[in-house]
Amino acid sequence: LVILSFSKPVFADTISTGGGNKIHFINLKSKSGSDAILLESNGHFGLIDMGEDYDFPDGSNPLYPDRWGISRANEDTIEDRLFRHLKQVGVKKLDFILGTHVHSDHIGTADEVLKRYPVDRFYLKKYSDERITTQWRLWDNLYNYDNAVRTALERGVTLIQDISDQDSHFKLGNMDI
C-alpha cells in the first residue's frame, strides 16, 4: 500500500540578491495586508513579520475585549501559508524574528513560530497604543503581543525590545542586516 500526500505549494515572490542571499515575500495578496518576509543566506534564516493568525480573544478577559475589526476570516490569515513556505524552503531554525510593529497582522503568528522553530533572537518593540486614535484599530494587538512575549520568554528566546545601535546591525550568513 502506497499513500501519497501532496501539500499545496506556496507561491512566494523570491528575489536572489547574489552570494546565495534570497528574500522571500510571503503574502496573501488580499485586502488584509498580512505578510511575512523570509531572509535566507548561507543556510541562515531570519523572519520579518509573521502575519495574522487564527487565534483571537473571545472577549471573556477584559484586558482582551472582543472588538470590531478583529480578523476572524480564514482568508485574512497567513499562518498556514507561512508554515508551508518555511517547510518548502527547508527552514529548521531561525536566527531571528522581527516584528516591525505590534499590529496583529504583523505579529499574530509570532507565538506559533516560536513554538515550532528554535529562534535565537526576537526583536519586538514594547507595546504601545498611544498613537492609535480610534478604538476599533486596537484590534487584538495587545492579545497577540502578550502571547508572543510570553512564548518567547517560555522558550528562552533572547527578547530585544530596546534596540540599541549595537543591536541594530548584525550578520545573517553573508547578509548585512
Predicted regions and their residues:
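Non-globular, low-confidence helical/coil segments that flank catalytic cores
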Residues: 7-177
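Bacterial N-terminal signal peptides
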Residues: 1-5
